[in-house]
Amino acid sequence: MLYWMLETGRSLHSGKKYYQRYIFYMIQSKLLVSSVMKKIFMGLSGFFLITFLVLHVSLNMMSVLSENSYNAISHFMGYNPIVQFIGQPILAFGVFFHFIMGFVLELQNRRARPIAYAYNNGAANSSWSSRNMIISGLVILAYLGLHWYDLWFQELNYKFIVKKVPNSARYYGELRDKFANPLRVILYCCAFILLGFHLWHGFSSSMQSVGLSNKYSLALSKFGKAFAVGVPSAFVFIAVFHYFSQL
């Protein structure tokens, strides 16, 4: 009888340990899946914003190439209901979703490796851009807030508060007026230089998040670095061009 009780106790204890391990494994599995899904959504939102950057720099470059074309495209986008009431809200959501997901993942990584952060020599194991994504992201988000206030809110005032008559020839002149201010040009250029550092790591990270980096890693890495340099440089060129062409 004593032997049976001892064996039963051992079995119950073993079963309890097994159950605890099972629960721990399930929690870890769910956390892993959750983390992977967050990274995938982070990568997809990054792709969305990269696509927007291509469209945005293409439109802005038209201001250098053709005043009439820039006015025509800007007027179309400014009064197209699909762009205004569907495209812009989606863009705003994409921006905030991307940054919120980035902050959440950064906090998760810091909690998961508290000791490693204390002893890890970051400069020896990763680039400056990868170690400071959250800093560059915060600065870019702050700049976007100013940029939206400067452009989007002024546009809302023009259309819905003052209710001025639509003028398709006003956009080029307004752009030139903004870039006549040297402080504005400096802030604009600094923001896009920082965006370049953000993209230097962010482009390849987005590829990795959606599973494209393994098969095309070398080509995508080269393209990502070219994109990180080329697109911000184009934005900087546009600002500098309009400033110096007015001196």
Regions found by a protein language model. Give the residues of each.
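Membrane-embedded alpha-helical bundles that constitute the cytochrome b-like, heme-associated redox core
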Residues: 18-247
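Polybasic, lysine-rich low-complexity intrinsically disordered segments
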Residues: 8, 16-17
